[in-house]
Each structure stands twice: as structure tokens, then as C-alpha cells.
Regions:
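Polybasic/polar functional segments that serve as interface/processing modules
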Residues: 4-10, 45, 52, 210-214, ...
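Active-site acidic/histidine clusters and adjacent loop/turn architecture
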Residues: 17-72
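Soluble extramembrane domains of integral membrane proteins
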Residues: 59, 63-95, 99, 145-163
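A solvent-exposed interaction/effector surface
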Residues: 77, 125, 171-205
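Aromatic- and glycine-enriched beta-alpha-beta binding-site module
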Residues: 77-137
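Compact, glycine/acidic-enriched structural inserts
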Residues: 112-171
Length: 227
């Protein structure tokens, strides 16, 4: 496979579908080697190829194949759902100078239900969210230029994420950035059918989407990396 892999094999999706039906240790443990061969290794090949291509898109992104990929095991300590395994595989690419789940980054996952690729800021802490909102308020033209660009609209769509119903405290209700200031999450991406993970265009589409989302992630991270 090497670095030229362009999609996951059909057996990857077949295994994830079977895992969704049989999410039990006694089913998975005898098939751990099959999971590694059918799912983990092809995904790792995708991530290793991304390590080269993402450097030209956003040199600030950290692409470490060993840490980018999420483990298949679920942390069930504080969850009512005690199924031991995730039924999707995913990888995340954070920004240099920020922790893995701090700030904005790029991300994709493959599940039996969908493929999602994109990025943004998923769960900023209160102080981080305030810093990002202040940054948007002072740079609304730049923000608008990113999320309303033809390429962003064509390949990603619209900015998404949880939103407040009103402009947050501390900002004028009629602020030019009012609609952006309401966001509690800043997400941008593309959802595709699960079978698309096995399409020869999977990798090229992933690169195209990441190329459009990277400027948004860079903009959102500016007030965080410069603190």
C-alpha cells in the first residue's frame, strides 16, 4: 500500500459494520489481528500519506501518524454506554503549539453510517472561546472572506456548530460579526456516504476539503497561539 493508497479497502468497512453488530470483547479479541490488517493498517497508510501533503497546505499542522489516529477502545468509566469499542475510526491533526484537543485542527472519520472530513474548533474552553470571539469581532472581514469564499462554499458548504440564540454578552447586538459571534463551535466539513471511504477519489477529496478548512483553522488559532 505505502504512501500511494487513495482509499480504504472494502474489507475495512465490512469489519466496522460487523463490529457495530457485535460490539463485545469476546467477539473482537479473537479478531484483533484482522482489525489491524483490515482497518488500522490501511488507515495508517492514509495518515502517513497525509503527513507529506499537509505540509504544503498548512505547515503549522502536526502530523504524527502514531498520535493522529484514535484508539478503537472506548473509555467507558463515566459513560452509561458500556460497549467497549468505537464503531468508527478517526484521525485528528492539531495545530503546532496547541494540545491535541485544544484550538482548531483538521479531522476525518469513517463509520458504518457516514464519512466525515473537515475540521474546526469542537469544544473550546470558556477563555479560548472568548479570545476567538474577540478575534472575530476585530477581523470580521477576514472571517467572512474565508467562510464565504467560492472554494469553501463549493467543497465544504457553510460554517456549522452549536450556536447561541443571541449575541453573547459584551458584544453589540448589531455587531458586523453578530452571526459568527453566536457560535460556540466552529465546524466546517463534508459528510459523505460510508462507501465513499472505498472510492478511489476518497484521498483527493480529503485533500481538497482540508485545503479549504485549513485557513479557517489557522484564523481561529491565531489568538490562541499568540497568547
Amino acid at each position: 500500500m505505502g504512501q500511494r493508497i487513495s482509499s480504504l479497502p472494502r474489507r475495512s468497512l465490512a469489519f466496522l459494520r460487523a463490529l457495530k453488530r457485535n460490539n463485545r470483547r469476546e467477539w473482537f479479541q479473537p479478531r484483533k489481528e484482522q482489525f489491524d490488517a483490515d482497518v488500522r493498517e490501511p488507515l495508517l497508510a492514509i495518515v502517513e500519506r497525509l503527513a507529506d501533503d499537509l505540509r504544503s497546505i498548512a505547515p503549522e499542522i502536526v502530523v504524527d501518524p502514531k498520535t493522529a489516529m484514535y484508539r478503537i477502545y472506548r473509555d467507558t468509566r463515566f459513560s452509561e454506554n458500556k460497549t467497549p469499542y468505537k464503531t468508527h475510526v478517526a484521525a485528528v491533526f492539531p495545530w503546532r503549539g496547541l494540545a491535541k484537543h485544544e484550538g482548531a485542527g483538521l479531522y476525518f472519520h469513517v463509520s458504518p453510517d457516514e464519512v466525515w472530513m473537515g475540521g474546526g474548533m469542537y469544544s473550546p474552553q470558556t477563555a479560548q472561546l472568548q479570545a476567538v470571539r474577540e478575534h472575530i469581532a476585530g477581523n470580521v472581514r477576514r472571517m467572512r472572506a474565508i467562510v464565504e469564499s467560492p472554494g469553501f462554499r463549493r467543497h465544504v458548504g457553510e460554517l456549522e456548530g452549536e450556536r447561541l440564540q443571541r449575541v453573547p454578552h459584551g458584544f453589540p447586538k448589531d455587531h458586523a460579526a453578530a452571526e459568527y459571534l453566536k457560535y460556540r463551535q466552529f465546524l466546517a466539513g463534508r459528510e459523505l456516504p460510508p462507501a465513499f471511504a472505498c472510492n478511489p477519489k476518497f484521498y483527493s477529496t480529503l485533500i481538497t476539503v482540508f485545503r479549504q478548512v485549513a485557513p479557517l483553522a489557522r484564523f481561529l488559532n491565531e489568538p490562541l497561539v499568540n497568547r
